[in-house]
């Protein structure tokens, strides 16, 4: 007899011996952790649904420019937006004059 058939027979006998049936484990929802939001510093609201904030996430500081939406009375971040590292923010800030010049050239 092959080991494959033998193992199957053992499994059948083992399940016959068990008088209890085990229900799958229930998933327990994690409690909402607002500690991430407490690290957010809202710098300004750009429009009704857009804001700039500085936050600490995974031990790093990020400048977050993002759209938000309201669900069940809570304001939540949406997918549309960008999170800049401090280095990226400094690069953008150093080019602010170039951006202003390009805006004035197009106006």
UniProtKB/Swiss-Prot annotation:
Gene3D superfamilies: Transcriptional Coactivator Pc4, Chain A. InterPro entries: PC4_C, ssDNA-bd_transcriptional_reg, Sub1/Tcp4-like. Keywords: Activator, DNA-binding, Nucleus, Transcription, Transcription regulation. Residues 7-23 have a biased composition (Basic and acidic residues). It is found in: Nucleus. GO terms for biological process: positive regulation of transcription initiation by RNA polymerase II. Pfam families: PC4. The keyword Nucleus applies. One of its GO terms (molecular function) is transcription coactivator activity. Its main location: nucleus. Residues 1-40 are annotated as: Disordered. Belongs to the transcriptional coactivator PC4 family. This is RNA polymerase II transcriptional coactivator KIWI. It comes from Arabidopsis thaliana.
């Amino acid at each position: 007899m092959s080991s494959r058939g033998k193992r199957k027979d053992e499994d059948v006998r083992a399940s016959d011996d068990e008088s209890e049936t085990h229900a799958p484990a229930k998933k327990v929802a994690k409690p909402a952790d607002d500690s991430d939001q407490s690290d957010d510093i809202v710098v300004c609201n750009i429009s009704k649904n857009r804001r700039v904030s500085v936050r600490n996430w995974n031990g790093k500081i990020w400048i977050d420019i993002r759209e938000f939406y309201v669900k069940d009375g809570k304001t939540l971040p949406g997918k549309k937006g960008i999170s800049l590292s401090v280095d990226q923010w400094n690069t953008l800030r150093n080019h602010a004059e170039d951006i202003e010049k390009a805006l004035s050239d197009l106006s």
